[in-house]
């Protein structure tokens, strides 16, 4: 009987031992290399139990995982270091913890010192934290000393916090790496090390594009200068350069930093150019990014406003009673090419020359004080057109004025060529209009004004220099961008005297204009393209080479009604 009772006890012991063994062999997320090859269950210990039993504890390591495609270019040692940081326990910095400013492999930081000089330290911690927070970097308020005149040797000493908290010492390595980082492993933001690596890389790219500070001369900026794109400056403020005072043994205060490196002023027509006596901390004229005045070094330049990172110059209203026009900027660039060729070649080595036109809202004080410069025949609503246009437009005086102007300006040889072109299409115009009644001619003018009113809404938002003229060449509409491009004012082209499109072209372009118009007047319905024409400006010694696109608009009778010309400068 005793033997019979012992049998179930032995069975229960074996079952318990097998259950405990199964509990010990709990699956892990990542097996070692030996268990991975043998497809055996591994555990979280290193060396694992199976490798201890087989005597392979010396080579028991985590099995390598298959790399993702987007991590193909990342070095393996960097990935392994990042995995170690991801598996480390979370660390909370105490009040009296010491920080060693040593860069970690995946900490959110700006590019290394190979391309960047040190950031000027200042006691504007809140501004710095706020600005860098938008780019994914969150510097601690303890990282910047309150005394900006400390030398690099004294920077390693502890500094007292204004609220009794101890300041961490600053190593000299901070001045070599830019922004500091912790020497203790930080907790990653994502459970996946690959995702954390990806977002850290994106943060570095954002910092490199928006807050990059170049150490040496490179294709990304001027020597030892801080470049900021206008997209990150408040109030669409332009940018200039502030030279970094790197050779001093102590980090100067921010006020001295701005005063010592203040460039010359560009005061051509701009009332916002700052004088040397202006206060750098004037709250109405500046706002801070990384402790540096933005509006100040945007307007303080001896050359026109330019985004040097992309070699783009600014045109249009400057916020005062002055407009920067294309001829003035081109003249200033030519002066820079002659007087300061180093700056000229460096800007052009980064990117091709380009221009951007600024727009000021209608509610701005600059636009409130301006009188509307519109044609007497311009209408606001379609009802005005049908109510006020009660007689046809006479084209005969326009042709007589055009012929008189051509005879006064051009020699006989060119007049003969233009007369041949005019003779090819003018008889057709006369024949078409002879069969029309007065009501038809009134309807033609109503169609012209109604079409011009529709095109006005498109031209205002297109941003392309545009001008509209009648089939006689009389200018009927001028876009704002065309005035910025050429320097002509609307009242000079529309209100004061009758102007023709040929008055804005040079001699060769005028001859080509008549030859081309004679071909498209009763030919191609869509229009034509002048590959190149030269525009005249109010300054007789300044001419602008442009590419011109024509769009021919006909009325309901098939007669050319208006020509819309789009001009873009050839840089």
Curated annotation (Swiss-Prot):
GO biological process: cellular response to starvation; gluconeogenesis
Comp. bias (Low complexity): 10-21, 239-256
PROSITE patterns (alphabetical): ZN2_CY6_FUNGAL_1, ZN2_CY6_FUNGAL_2
Domain PAS: 403-475
Lineage: superkingdom: Eukaryota
UniProt biased composition (Polar residues): 143-180, 216-238, 257-282
Keywords: Activator, DNA-binding, Gluconeogenesis, Metal-binding, Nucleus, Transcription, Transcription regulation, Zinc
Start-end of DNA-binding region: 20-48
InterPro entries cross-referenced by the UniProt entry: ERT1_acuK_gluconeogen_tf, PAS_13, Zn2-C6_fun-type_DNA-bd_sf, Zn2Cys6_DnaBD
This protein's GO CC annotations: nucleus
Main location per the UniProt record: nucleus
Disordered as annotated region, ranges: 1-25, 76-117, 141-187, 216-282
A Pfam family assignment: PAS_13
GO molecular function: DNA-binding transcription factor activity, RNA polymerase II-specific; RNA polymerase II transcription regulatory region sequence-specific DNA binding; zinc ion binding
Gene3D superfamilies: Zn(2)-C6 fungal-type DNA-binding domain (4.10.240.10)
Subcellular location: Nucleus
Family per record: Belongs to the ERT1/acuK family.
Biological role: Transcription factor which regulates nonfermentable carbon utilization. Activator of gluconeogenetic genes.
Protein name stated in the entry: Transcription activator of gluconeogenesis ERT1
Protein encoded by which gene: ERT1
């Amino acid at each position: 009987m005793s033997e019979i009772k012992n049998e179930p006890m032995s069975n229960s012991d074996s079952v318990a031992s097998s259950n405990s063994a199964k509990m010990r062999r709990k699956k892990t997320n990542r097996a070692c290399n030996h268990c991975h090859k043998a497809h055996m269950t591994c555990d979280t210990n290193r060396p694992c139990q199976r490798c201890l039993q087989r005597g392979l504890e010396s080579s028991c390591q985590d099995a390598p995982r298959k790399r993702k495609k987007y991590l193909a270019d990342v070095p393996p040692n960097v990935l392994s270091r990042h995995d170690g940081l991801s598996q480390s326990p979370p660390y909370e910095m105490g009040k009296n913890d010491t920080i060693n400013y040593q860069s970690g492999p995946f900490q959110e930081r700006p590019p290394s010192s190979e391309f960047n000089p040190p950031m000027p330290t200042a006691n504007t911690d809140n501004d710095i934290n706020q600005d860098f927070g938008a780019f994914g970097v969150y510097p601690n308020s303890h990282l910047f000393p309150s005394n900006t005149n400390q030398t690099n040797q004294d920077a390693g000493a502890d500094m007292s916090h204004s609220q009794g908290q101890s300041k961490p010492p600053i190593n000299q390595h901070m001045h070599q790496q830019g922004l500091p980082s912790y020497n203790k492993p930080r907790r990653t933001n994502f459970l996946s090390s690959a995702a954390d690596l990806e977002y850290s890389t994106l943060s570095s790219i954002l910092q490199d594009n928006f807050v990059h500070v170049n150490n040496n001369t490179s294709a990304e900026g001027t020597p030892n200068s801080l470049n900021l794109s206008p997209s990150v400056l408040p109030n669409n403020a332009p940018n200039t350069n502030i030279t970094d005072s790197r050779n001093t043994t102590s980090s100067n205060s921010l006020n001295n930093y701005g005063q010592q490196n203040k460039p010359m002023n560009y005061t051509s027509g701009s009332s916002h150019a700052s004088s040397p006596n202006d206060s750098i901390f004037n709250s109405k004229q500046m706002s801070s990014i990384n402790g540096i005045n933005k509006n100040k070094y945007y307007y303080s330049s001896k050359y026109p406003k330019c985004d040097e990172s992309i070699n783009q110059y600014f045109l249009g209203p400057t916020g005062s009673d002055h407009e920067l026009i294309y001829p003035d900027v081109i003249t200033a660039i030519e002066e820079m090419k002659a007087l300061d060729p180093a700056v000229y070649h460096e800007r052009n080595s980064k990117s091709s020359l380009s221009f951007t036109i600024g727009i000021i809202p209608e509610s701005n004080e600059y636009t409130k004080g301006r009188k509307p410069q519109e044609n007497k025949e311009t209408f606001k609503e379609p009802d005005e057109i049908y109510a006020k246009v009660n007689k046809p437009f006479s084209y005969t005086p326009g042709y007589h004025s055009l012929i008189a102007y051509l005879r006064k300006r051009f020699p006989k040889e060119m007049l003969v060529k233009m007369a041949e072109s005019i003779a090819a299409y003018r008889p057709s115009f006369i024949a078409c209009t002879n069969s029309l009644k007065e009501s038809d001619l009134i309807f033609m003018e109503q169609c012209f004004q109604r079409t011009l009113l529709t095109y006005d809404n498109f031209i205002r938002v297109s941003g392309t220099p545009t001008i509209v003229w009648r089939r006689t060449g009389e200018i009927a509409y001028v876009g704002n961008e065309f005035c910025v491009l050429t320097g002509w004012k609307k009242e000079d082209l529309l209100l004061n005297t009758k102007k023709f499109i040929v008055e804005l072209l040079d001699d060769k372009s005028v001859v080509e204009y008549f030859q081309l118009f004679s071909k498209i007047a009763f030919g191609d319905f869509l229009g034509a393209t002048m590959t190149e024409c030269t525009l005249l400006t109010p300054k007789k010694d300044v001419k602008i080479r442009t590419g011109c696109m024509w769009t021919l608009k006909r009325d309901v009778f098939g007669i050319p009604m208006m020509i819309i010309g789009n001009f873009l400068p050839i840089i």
